[in-house]
Amino acid sequence: MGGFLRGSPEPGPAGGSGGSAGGRLALLWIVPLTLSGLLGVAWGASSLGAHHIHHFHGSSKHHSVPIAIYRSPASLRGGHAGTTYIFSKGGGQITYTWPPNDRPSTRADRLAIGFSTVQKEAVLVRVDSSTGLGDYLELHIHQGKIGVKFNVGTDDIAIEEINAIINDGKYHVVRFTRSGGNATLQVDNWPVIERYPAGNNDNERLAIARQRIPYRLGRVVDEWLLDKGRQLTIFNSQATIKIGGKERGHPFQGQLSGLYYNGLKVLNMAAENDANIVIEGNVRLVGEVPSSMTTESTATAMQSEMSTSVMETTTTLATSTARRGKAPTKEPIGQTTDDILVASAECPSDDEDIDPCEPSSGGLANPTRAGGGREYPGSSEVIRESSSTTGMVVGIVAAAALCILILLYAMYKYRNRDEGSYHVDESRNYISNSAQSNGAVIKEKQPNSAKSSNKNKKNKDKEYYV
């Protein structure tokens, strides 16, 4: 029993060493799992983040710098951001009409739209005031150049981008702003064009008028001129927004995307069947197929459209099979739309009684092209979605491989551990485990122990007497 008590402290360090080894092994398990999880999440997040980045290639003048797309507003996350309509041969029109008691009068306007066409003459968008007022704003293509013409009570004011070629069938973005009689126009990434009409200052008009006004009528005329000067900077009682230009004699043929005007996303509203919008003529929402038409007739119609001057920048399965000369299948036609940026609108600040407006923000979409060729809006979105999924899968596989390598290394290191720490002193009498668990064996050993002790006592007695 004494041998057992003396030998019992020895296994203690071995057990403690085993516990620390187990802790180290657990630590080696936790660290790679944590790192692998972070690696997988980071890889997947970077791939998903790349989905929202638009890369632009091409000439130094067209789309050389990416423009940020603001996705934060809830209105852009409603599922219709970048709604695209195709205006086919023969023309069509989308008309939005303000309710009679809700027609705005604005000192500043913002217009943004994406389009593609090959026409040299066309009217894209026109905003008109109520009958009898004569105020209007028109976005048009004249001799292959994009321009805007408007009138808010004086003469027609025109602004045009003469350097950019926009009737090349490629996707372009135009942004227009108006503040009183002043205006700016930008196409894609070309420099902003500014227009400041002469005599737009109230003080200049007053100085000219005072020279011919009798002194006794000066105060009354001054007040009238001031009021008239303010009125000549306001777009009064806006009534309708007409998209497509069918009524103007130059119907637009091509694609229009994500129209934004002073907070209104008219194409989005048209896709949602807004009660204030009327669609007429050959106008089709991208991805929409009339229920009365079969897949074969739809493919034939698309093929005939592509043979005309209308450059439809949308790709569908039926169109692609028709181009290859194969028989169209019964597979559904997929919808591919591009994101559209929306320029923010500012509410006019005026002392007059103007209907309140609510500013909104957003962004306008830029085209994506590769190698100088024409890439249809929306096709790159599918590629980015698949690449994001691939990146996430690769990240998970890499993390799993890292875990396996670390596990194999740990198993190799701790499989043949040195057992030198378990020293057994042969000179000491250790009782085996079977002796600890079997009481009968211990009792059998007791007589022998008693005899050995008596023998030692006798030897001591002998030594004492000697």
Curated annotation (Swiss-Prot):
Residues 347-383, 433-466 are annotated as: Disordered. Belongs to the neurexin family. The chain crosses the membrane at residues 391-411. Pfam families: Laminin_G_2, Syndecan. Residues 85-283 form the Laminin G-like domain. One of its GO terms (biological process) is angiogenesis. Residues 45-390 are extracellular. Brain and arteries (at protein level). Residues 1-44 form the signal peptide. This is Neurexin-1-beta. Its main location: membrane. The gene is NRXN1. InterPro entries: ConA-like_dom_sf (IPR013320), Laminin_G (IPR001791), Neurexin-like (IPR003585), Neurexin-related_CASP (IPR050372), Syndecan/Neurexin_dom (IPR027789). Neuronal cell surface protein that may be involved in cell recognition and cell adhesion by forming intracellular junctions through binding to neuroligins. May play a role in formation or maintenance of synaptic junctions. May mediate intracellular signaling. Plays a role in angiogenesis. Residues 412-466 are cytoplasmic. One of its GO terms (cellular component) is membrane. Keywords: Angiogenesis, Cell adhesion, Membrane, Signal, Transmembrane, Transmembrane helix. It is a single-pass type I membrane protein. It is found in: Membrane.
